[in-house]
């Protein structure tokens, strides 16, 4: 058997590492190691979506001093007045927390994931939300990004189990369905 070594501290984008998008609490024989193609898919989600989501959310609801090169693709952010450094309303920069990204077949089976899950190819992430309002705001920003950039996504699923909220967000290299669902139990 050939042993493969991957640097899990590799940055997929400015604020996201490979380790963040491959972490799991499930112990498996083969680990949770993505293929090169899965890493490229994760990188695309981070660069094209999660960085924009982080910027958009923080511009609207977090620290107004957050900066980023280029204009925001988020329509809600583009309409905001420019930040003034003397603003009394400055809160800390709020990170986007990924609870699940890439899943090996073994991890996917153990966590009860769907057989054809986008997580298996690195095309999906689950984004932690801190309640229904936070979840709806994050989903709205993702939709604004899609509209502002004319990029498509495969799935935007707002999920709830008891008091736990998250967004399942998937982007495939092609054949995206723009499927939007609520799955609250």
What does each model-found stretch correspond to?
Residues 8, 12-14, 29, 98, ...:
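Glycine-rich, flexible loop/turn motifs
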Residues 46-49, 107, 123, 134, ...:
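Amphipathic alpha-helical interface surfaces
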Residues 93-100, 153-158:
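Surface-exposed patches in mature extracellular/periplasmic domains of secreted proteins
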Residues 97-99, 126-128, 168:
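Structural recognition of the beta-strand scaffold that forms the well-ordered cores
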Residues 102-125:
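Short, surface-exposed glycine/acidic/tryptophan-bearing loops
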Residues 116, 121, 129-185:
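Catalytic cores and adjacent binding grooves of peptidoglycan-active enzymes
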């Amino acid at each position: 058997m050939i042993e493969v070594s991957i640097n899990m501290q590799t940055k997929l984008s400015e604020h996201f590492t490979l380790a963040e998008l491959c972490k799991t609490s499930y112990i498996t024989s083969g680990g949770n190691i993505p293929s090169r193609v899965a890493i490229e898919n994760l990188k695309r989600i981070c660069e094209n979506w999660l960085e924009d989501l982080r910027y958009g959310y923080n511009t609207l609801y977090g620290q107004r001093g957050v900066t980023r090169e280029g204009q925001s693709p988020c329509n809600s952010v583009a309409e905001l007045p420019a930040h003034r450094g003397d603003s009394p309303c400055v809160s800390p920069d709020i990170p986007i927390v990924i609870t699940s990204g890439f899943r090996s077949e073994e991890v996917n089976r153990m966590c009860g994931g769907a057989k054809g899950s986008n997580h298996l190819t690195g095309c999906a992430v689950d984004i932690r939300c801190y309640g229904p309002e936070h979840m709806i705001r994050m989903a709205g920003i993702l939709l604004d990004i899609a509209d502002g950039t004319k990029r498509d996504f495969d799935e935007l699923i707002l999920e709830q189990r008891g008091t736990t909220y998250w967004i399942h967000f998937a982007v495939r290299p092609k054949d995206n369905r723009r499927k939007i669902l609520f799955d609250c139990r």
